[in-house]
Amino acid sequence: PPGAVKIMQDPSIFVGEGLPVAFSSISFLFYFLPLFFIIYYLIPARAKNVVLLAGSLFFYAWGEPRWILLLLASILVTWLLGRAMRPEASAGRRRGLLILGLVFQLGLLVAVKYAGFFFGAFIDLPKLHLPLGVSFYTFHAISYLVDVYRQKTPPQKNLLRLGLYLALFPKLVMGPIVPYHELEPALAQRTIDAQDVSDGCFRFTIGLAKKALLADALAGLVTGIWGDLASLTVLSAWLGLIGYALQLYFDFSGYSDMAIGLGRM
């Protein structure tokens, strides 16, 4: 089908390649990352969350300026609903607030992902691409609200920390989705460890090599094969399918390694 062929010709749509500050981009590697870490390591511990959130929002706004308000709205509404679900509130009130949060978060997700599908035949909607990372920060928000509702964790009083949980740039665009109660201790207090920084740099470099040396090389092969369907043979079709599968694997694996490395650093 034409859609499948388009994806095979450009599978990078799955891995955030439209973002000007993608982890493998020149802008990220030589401008954003060095400047961010210099500031982050030099400032006092009490200000690190401020810099980390500001850097994460800048990272997202650089790539998605038109959708930054949606991310900020998700952070604010999630924080307010969590605060309202305090332990002394009645079970019915807590349940109602959870349902309200689920409707809000999933409603936003459905609106931006499927509005064109449902209403495009009736009204002329502007053609906007999907906000990068919307699924990930939406489900992170839901994870937080569910944890508060189940009393696995108290409501987060600090808006900065909750914003950091939803918008932390290493996991903002491609995940992974980490339950709030697992990440909560690190939001409150972290220590910089030389071994963590070293291991993080190594893991990031491995991921970058997977992306730049393997995935991108395979992308050229796949594009060449699926870009000329008229001369496609059984052998070249199989080669294209295998190359495409390997490209996706190294794209996702490389991105995951880079995200883990950034987190360690």
List PLM regions with ranges.
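Membrane-embedded transmembrane alpha-helical bundles that form the catalytic cores
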Residues: 6-265
